[in-house]
Amino acid sequence: MINSIRIGTRNSTLALIQTNLVIAQIKQFFPDINCEIVPIITSGDLIQNKPLYDIGGKALFLKEIEQALLDKKIDLAVHSLKDIPGRIPVDLVIAAVLEREDPRDVLVCLNYKSIETLPQNAVIGSSAVRRKAFIKKIRPDLNIKVFRGNVDSRIKKLMTGEVDATILSYAGLKRLNAFNKKYCHLIEYSQILPCVGQGVIAVEIRKDDNAMFNICNQINHIPTFELIKPERAFLEHLDANCSTPIGAYSQYLDAYNIQTDFMLGKLDCNKIIFQTEITNINTSRECGIKAAKMMLAQQ
């Protein structure tokens, strides 16, 4: 019987909150296991003055954590699923996810409640090319400023007038207890499609660690695990990075069928392709691959 688990995570307030949510799930099934949080500073945390697509993509938020996992310095890692590239090291696996939080984006703005009502040539802070593509589609006149850092720092920049608005994920704001209806306005899926895996907390382990597999099997939220399969397959087949605007959102039509909306764009944001697929849960991965192939052919 395992007595303790070393859990690796980024050393940010949100990452630590998410890690404690995983620990709470573990404790429900294994109350006697001691869970030690191992905060790890990643390259993505250190480099804040450049867009992610210029410095290696979201994998920079995982590199050091995954290496610690491979080196057996930690037993499992907790990530935001949206930060995990389509392809991960062959010796690692996403073994569990928690129940998905609402994956919508949020317009954070003091004086306006929607992208459409922002003043002409307003400045939006964002570093995500997916959001940039949608913003340019909705309002080509808007200016987009590279905007990185944690949620608190981005909101502070907004409050001091550095930008007119920014876009953040609802899941992160909610977990930080930072969603304020006075200046946080939900954006519907029909306007901005979420990032692949947005709103999902993922647990990554070594493939050969049977003890961790047993724990992950207990805490895994199977409905969410099934939902993310077409999204992740889409991402994996595209082998996309932060320079490719892509999005995907899956939802259950009933107990056995999933509808997934996909989007694929170009860095210059001149073209966005959309596709919707409906599939049985048993063939959901194939659905994501099919969508990727068809959409690549349209580019």
Swiss-Prot record:
GO terms for biological process: protoporphyrinogen IX biosynthetic process. It comes from the Bacteria. One of its GO terms (cellular component) is cytoplasm. It is an enzyme of class 2 (transferase). Its EC number is 2.5.1.61. Pathway: Porphyrin-containing compound metabolism; protoporphyrin-IX biosynthesis; coproporphyrinogen-III from 5-aminolevulinate: step 2/4. CDD domains: PBP2_PBGD_2 (cd13647). Binds 1 dipyrromethane group covalently. Its cofactor is dipyrromethane. SUPFAM superfamilies: Periplasmic binding protein-like II, Porphobilinogen deaminase (hydroxymethylbilane synthase), C-terminal domain. PROSITE patterns: PORPHOBILINOGEN_DEAM. The porphobilinogen subunits are added to the dipyrromethane group. Monomer. Tetrapolymerization of the monopyrrole PBG into the hydroxymethylbilane pre-uroporphyrinogen in several discrete steps. This is Porphobilinogen deaminase. It comes from Rickettsia typhi (strain ATCC VR-144 / Wilmington).
